Amino acid sequence: MRTAISILVWLGAGWLALESLPANASADPATELTRCAELELRVAGLLRVGTALLYLDQCSDAKRILEPVPKKFSLELARPFRGQDLVATARSTLKQNLALRDDEDLPAPLRCMADAYVDADSGDRYDVVFRPDNGLSMYLNGELLEQCDASSGAEKYFMIWFGEQPFHRRMRDRLLEQALNHSGPASS
């Protein structure tokens, strides 16, 4: 069951429901970035699987989400996920967006980050952070899992969620729309 849920969520099953959360919902207090968007993720509109959050320096940077601007994508889990399922889906989604055939063709920083996923339980939180001067970092519950170099193209890891072929198009669109319409002060 856990594997099926992971695959459905990460591959973007057509019936994954997205619900906006109120602006005062909790966010990571340690971030220097502004929480610009937050969506609850549900399978079939019933089963809550988690919450997706987007952080940017300025919410208007959502227009440049795939450019080398500071950003963070967080996933708060409401269900357990197997790391190997997330690794496989991250690699597959990146290859689709970059028009690559083999895992070995993925640029090193993207492969490094895709391989960082580990098994996680309900209540855990993944944070993927890109800073132009520091590269990519992945955290689980605030603990660093992996840091990958800042070589050219590392920001493209965010294609998983925001590329032309994201794992879920409606989630991408709703997060970006929320960020561009964000008018309140930074949430923390």
Q: In which residue ranges do the predicted regions lie?
A:
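Positively charged n-region of N-terminal signal peptides that target proteins for export
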Residues: 1-4
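Bacterial N-terminal signal peptides
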Residues: 6-19
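Terminal leader/tail segments of proteins
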Residues: 21-188
